């Protein structure tokens, strides 16, 4: 299948990183909902095709640009959510908790600008600001984006309450802060299908300064933090639970 021409600049990011020619990419997929994303990942896993997750390409490190031939998954199509009990719909991409108006569910394919525009009439805002308002929320979570406000308000990690993660074989995980916690350096996660994933966290000490190298790993950690900043190597996000602040 020829590569998509939907987003012709999508083989280069904001840092002008360019690796393969468009012709070397087997296929570009732009899923529009979770079911399509699950099927795309499941097929790629079955056929052992390399996958690159692509957002708005506002990054400067080339992480959204395919390094080798394979499948590009364009996440800009995941810009809406289904209804959820206990949440009221504000926008196709935003649901606000009825019990706690400072909590909400957000689609990964929505931009930072669109999210804060939707929150403004509610007298709410989302503090993380990586310096590019076109950046997608999913990309912010995948990179644990920070920026000029991080000294006062912290990085993206501080505002993530839940994640719905699609693993590379199509398995779905629902992660909630405070519920899914490691036992020392060991973890166990139950997938939506009932499969249990168990193992050991990386055995290294993270520096107590700003650091973007490797997966976040600490004893007794919230396992949601393993996926925040993982840059797509563990899975894709189909739904993101955020904490907001009052204006």
Regions found by a protein language model. Give the residues of each.
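N-terminal flexible segment immediately upstream of the FAD-binding catalytic core
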Residues: 1-49, 56-103, 153, 239-246
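FAD-binding subdomain of flavoenzyme oxidoreductases
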Residues: 80-87, 94, 108, 112-113, ...
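Residue-level marker of motif borders
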Residues: 28, 52, 104, 134, ...
């Amino acid at each position: 299948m020829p590569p998509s021409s939907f987003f012709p600049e999508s083989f280069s990011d904001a840092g002008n990183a360019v690796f393969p020619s468009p012709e070397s990419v087997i296929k570009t997929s732009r899923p529009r909902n979770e079911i399509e994303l699950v099927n795309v990942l499941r097929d790629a896993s079955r056929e052992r095709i390399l996958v690159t997750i692509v957002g708005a390409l506002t990054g400067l490190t080339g992480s959204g640009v395919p390094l080798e031939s394979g499948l590009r998954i364009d996440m800009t199509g995941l810009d809406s959510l289904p209804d959820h009990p206990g949440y009221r719909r504000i926008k196709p991409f935003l649901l606000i908790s009825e019990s706690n108006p400072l909590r909400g569910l957000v689609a990964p394919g929505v931009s930072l600008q669109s999210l804060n525009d939707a929150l403004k009439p509610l007298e709410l805002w989302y503090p993380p600001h990586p310096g590019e308002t076109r950046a997608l929320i999913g990309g912010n979570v995948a990179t644990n984006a920070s920026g000029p406000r991080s000294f006062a308000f912290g990085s993206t990690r501080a505002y993530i309450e839940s994640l719905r993660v699609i693993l590379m074989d199509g398995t779905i995980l629902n992660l909630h802060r405070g519920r899914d916690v490691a036992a020392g350096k060991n973890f166990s996660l139950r997938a939506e299908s009932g499969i249990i994933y168990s193992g050991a966290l990386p055995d290294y000490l993270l520096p107590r300064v700003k650091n973007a190298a490797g997966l976040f790993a600490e004893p007794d950690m919230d396992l949601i933090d393993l996926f925040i900043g993982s840059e797509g190597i563990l899975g894709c996000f189909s739904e993101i639970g955020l904490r907001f602040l009052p204006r």
